[in-house]
């Protein structure tokens, strides 16, 4: 295990070129200059407060770490870094990893199974990612592992477990829940019609409300053109929660 393979001051010393290079990915190129400056400031603070822990031969340099920090901070650009309280480490495996998963069925029986995971997060504890999928998160494709796990963290600020309803005013909860479930049903209808592989939205969104919120958060930031026109009411709720409208950056 390698902790801090580079020093935080390296980013400060090389800031002029490093942040320009770190921002030069499809996910971030459409941010305004003002948004980029504020995102960099958040990312610098993120790297001061969190540890990136490279596991099983993963090598992190300043550029990789800066990009990871920028993506972590994109969802909380208008919320503030305090929304990422509750964890101090980001563990990074080289590829998806195997974990022992337990769940309780409808009659109370507990089952266990070894499953492959791309990432994990808990209310208190580290976020676990893998480098293979982190690299794919640089694109504006609708897939973003970092944003997915950040969304779970934001979701869990509203309770002990992720529910798909983040910390929003109580008066908005019923409408949020209605629109989120409508989106899940719509996605499931498409899956039933064309199959999981041909669906235009990741089929994982149809599994439960928490995953729907996390998956659609990926699309919100990395493929707004697929989210906004299909679920306009839910899109507006996401805009209100995140205090951003990524579709405006495409114009």
UniProtKB/Swiss-Prot annotation:
Keyword Nucleotide-binding: no
Main location: cytoplasm
Keyword hit for Transmembrane helix: no
Molecular function terms, GO-annotated: aminopeptidase activity; metallopeptidase activity; zinc ion binding
Domain of life, source organism: Bacteria
Required cofactor(s): Zn(2+)
Coiled coil ranges: none
Subunit description: Interacts with Mlc.
Cross-referenced HAMAP family: MtfA (MF_01593)
Homology family: Belongs to the MtfA family.
Protein name as catalogued: Mlc titration factor A
Record organism: Salmonella arizonae (strain ATCC BAA-731 / CDC346-86 / RSK2980)
Source taxonomy: Bacteria, Pseudomonadati, Pseudomonadota, Gammaproteobacteria, Enterobacterales
